[in-house]
């Protein structure tokens, strides 16, 4: 089953190390409205567990995670 959603904003965090991808994701989501989807791109392997923990802690929905080589792409839906 394919996941279907549209991206409202993109955030490029390539080259940034923990905790910057999470902090920049939080800042971007703070400016978005409920229901919008953020695409965050990171090259930090630590961002995979960090984003899962961030989603669980904040309640924002982690819709999908893609790995393309050394790049991680996260789709996060603002829920509140």
What residues fall within each predicted segment?
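Compositionally biased, disordered extreme N-termini, encompassing classical targeting presequences
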Residues: 1-8, 79-80
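Amphipathic, hydrophobic secondary-structure cores in small proteins
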Residues: 19-61
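C-terminal structural segments of small proteins and small subunits
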Residues: 52-80
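Helix-centric, low-specificity signal for extended rod-like, repetitive segments
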Residues: 10, 17-19, 49-50, 72
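Short amphipathic
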Residues: 7-14, 41
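Short secondary-structure boundary/capping segments
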Residues: 2-3, 30, 64-66
């Amino acid at each position: 089953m394919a996941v279907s959603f549209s991206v409202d904003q993109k955030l490029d965090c390539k080259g940034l190390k923990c905790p910057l991808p999470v902090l920049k994701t939080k800042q971007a989501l703070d400016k978005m409205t409920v229901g919008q989807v953020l695409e965050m791109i990171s090259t930090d392997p630590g961002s995979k567990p960090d984003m899962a923990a961030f989603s669980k802690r904040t309640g924002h929905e982690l819709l999908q995670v893609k790995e393309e080589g050394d790049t991680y792409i996260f789709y996060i839906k603002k829920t509140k």
